[in-house]
Amino acid sequence: MKKGKDAEQDFLNWLDENKFSYLYINQDTESFPKLFTNQVKRPDFLLLIDSIGLIAIDIKNYNIFKDKHLSLNYESEFKKTLAFERLFRLPVWYVYKNNDEWLWISALKAIEVAEMKINSGTNEQFLSLNIDDFTIVKSNSDIG
């Protein structure tokens, strides 16, 4: 949990340094309607990008495994994020912290390029994402 919060704070600082317009979304359970509990995962940020428009951002801070892959839990993360995208008609992007850069991938691209795997410890499905399928962003000049 702390690792995720640290990444959110780092991303918030990065947004400020790069002069982006954004909203940081409160993650308290009281701030989200009970109707959506356990069905929708809200993003961490809403980000306004001049060349694209408004997008939702979900920050991740996971370790790269086998030097090339990042994971995303299918049930608790991906399906609930896609429900948010569908309900609010707002594209969701996953942004993974990777040292001094950010790896970006849209939720729709993630499902297209990922390999579905099973976690041997939990028996849960997850998406295995190759880092080559991400867009690397170090500054706002790397975005459209």
Language model features with spans:
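A structural signal for short, well-ordered beta-strand segments and their strand-loop junctions
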Residues: 23-24, 56-58, 92-96
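Acidic-basic catalytic patches of nuclease active cores, encompassing PD-(D/E)XK
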Residues: 1-34
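Active-site metal-binding core of divalent-cation-utilizing nuclease and nuclease-like domains
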Residues: 24-52
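Mg2+/Mn2+-dependent nuclease catalytic core
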Residues: 62-84
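Intrinsically disordered, low-complexity terminal regions enriched in charged/polar residues
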Residues: 103-144
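Conserved catalytic cores of phosphodiester-cleaving nucleases, focusing on short active-site segments
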Residues: 15, 43-66
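Nucleic-acid nuclease catalytic cores
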Residues: 82-110
